[in-house]
């Protein structure tokens, strides 16, 4: 809800999809800088307290934008500043939230829990844009920010009532070194020694760059192609989240697709995005967005499960702190790319190009994973 309201406000203030792309980038680029440090924080401090702190900051940012916009603020750089602050907060919140899921259910229930957690997140992503679209259309962005601040307080209360004594605290006897530099490098060293894990994380980054550009292209489709305004923008986000909800629930039921399934879902994600760009009517476009959302969460849930299951307990936060910057940092760069393509060549062309690049990335990573598997088989045969 917060990000949709921010993106729509930037489009209102500037009239530029490229400016929306910059807003998206500013939300996610801080993760490239803060990510490795946030992983150390997540591994060393109680996740519940970290989540409460992050949620408090996010609620304050929403409340601040609500007051500023209600008072008639028009300086887009204030929104950009909020995007940066939210990006820093999210770079800590993301790894902490994922590891906290592990603490709630333990390793045995992790695959299903990741899928269910993604499903619940997508339910929020489905209701949030729909609610934001209605609120913005009826009362403006300030009301949407204020509503989100209130929801943030409710989430903070929910986290606070979780009992720490009931959590599963994993311990790894081969944990990372205790010196600060070693703690930061532990995640890098762990991932670099596991090329298949590295390739899955790289694929997430490439799909983030080429596929997860919804805030830019969906705003442009609503504004320039279908002329449906904020209500249409909210609808497009809602149906994408509906498909994502189904994808997350199915991924939770399957539990683990395996590397072939991860690569296949990534390739289909790019293909469905490309096809959505070619739809001649808004009704068909909306229908394709459901499929795009479905493939998005099939890939993301399966990739996140694979990364967490392969990471040792003592470095899980640090590994996720590398995974999220790759995924969301790619998202930031992809927002700039999609904004530039939309500005200069049109939003349909932008979606075709990024969809094709996402599909090509999946095929290349799939080939590299096949080569690694073949090499291992030959080594064992010797």
Regions found by a protein language model. Give the residues of each.
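Alpha-helical transmembrane-bundle signature of multi-pass membrane transport and export proteins
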Residues: 1-382
């Amino acid at each position: 809800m917060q990000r949709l309201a921010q993106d729509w406000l930037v489009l209102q203030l500037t009239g530029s999809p490229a400016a929306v792309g910059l807003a998206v980038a500013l939300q996610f680029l801080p993760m490239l800088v803060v990510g490795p440090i946030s992983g150390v924080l997540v591994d060393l401090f109680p996740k519940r307290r970290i989540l409460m702190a992050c949620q408090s900051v996010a609620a304050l940012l929403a409340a601040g934008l609500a007051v500023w916009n209600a008072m008639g603020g028009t300086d887009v750089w204030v929104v950009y500043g909020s995007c940066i602050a939210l990006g820093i907060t999210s770079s800590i919140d993301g790894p902490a939230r994922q590891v906290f899921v592990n603490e709630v259910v333990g390793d045995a229930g992790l695959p299903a829990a990741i899928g269910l957690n993604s499903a619940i997140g997508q339910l929020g992503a489905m209701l949030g844009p729909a609610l934001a679209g209605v609120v913005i259309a009826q009362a403006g962005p300030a009301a949407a920010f204020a509503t989100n601040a209130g929801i943030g307080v409710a989430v903070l209360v929910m986290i606070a009532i979780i009992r720490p004594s009931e959590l599963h605290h994993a311990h790894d006897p081969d944990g990372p070194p205790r010196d600060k530099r070693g703690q930061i490098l532990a995640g890098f060293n762990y991932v670099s020694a596991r090329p298949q894990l590295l390739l899955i994380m790289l694929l997430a980054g490439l799909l983030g760059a080429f596929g997860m550009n919804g805030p830019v292209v969906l705003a442009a489709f609503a504004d320039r192609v279908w002329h449906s305004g904020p209500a249409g923008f909210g609808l497009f986000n809602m149906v994408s989240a509906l498909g994502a909800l189904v994808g997350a629930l199915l991924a939770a039921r399957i539990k683990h697709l395996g590397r072939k399934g991860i690569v296949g879902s990534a390739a289909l994600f790019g293909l469905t995005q490309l096809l959505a760009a070619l739809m001649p009517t808004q009704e068909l476009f909306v229908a394709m967005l459901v499929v795009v959302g479905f493939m998005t969460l099939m890939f993301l849930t399966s990739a996140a499960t694979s990364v967490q299951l392969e990471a040792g307990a003592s470095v899980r936060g640090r590994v996720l702190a590398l995974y999220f910057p790759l995924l969301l940092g790619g998202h930031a760069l992809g927002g700039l790319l999609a904004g530039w393509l939309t500005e200069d060549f049109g939003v349909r062309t932008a979606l075709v190009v990024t969809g094709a690049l996402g599909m090509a990335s999946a095929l290349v990573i799939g080939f590299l994973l096949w080569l690694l598997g073949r090499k291992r088989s030959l080594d064992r045969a010797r």
